[in-house]
Amino acid sequence: MMICKVLVITVFCVLTVAFPSLDIDSINEELQDSIFDILNSTSDFQLASYEPSTSPPEDSTYQESNTDFMQTTYSKSIQISELSNGAETVSSSFLEEVTETSESTVEFPLAETTTFSSTS
């Protein structure tokens, strides 16, 4: 359906560019009216054919009681460090304590910086 709309608009633009010096205002108005009628009829058809479904899908795995995905809690999380070869297991309470303390600052080692001085 989108291709149809793009095609109609493209044809309209091509006709407008192809005949700019001719007095075709009446033809352009008729063409515009027909384009708008076509677009309105297709959009009305699409809206009429769409009927929203209020009933849940009839799937055996659908459970209405478990809709909140944020209830899942994990007892441990895995943190992978770039410096170590393996993974460290850190308890979630430790992560919560670290994120709750906003007073402490974390310092990361920076790469060696080289300063160049230019003499003029």
UniProtKB/Swiss-Prot annotation:
Alphabetical list of InterPro entries matching this protein: KAR_prot (IPR028062)
Domain of life assignment: Eukaryota
Pfam families tied to this protein: KAR
Residue pairs linked by disulfide bridges in the UniProt entry: none
Keyword annotations: Secreted, Signal
Annotated signal sequence range: 1-18
Keyword Secreted carried by entry: yes
Gene Ontology cellular-component annotations: extracellular region
Annotated localization: Secreted
Chain segments annotated as coiled-coil in the UniProt record: none
The name this protein goes by in its record: Kidney androgen-regulated protein
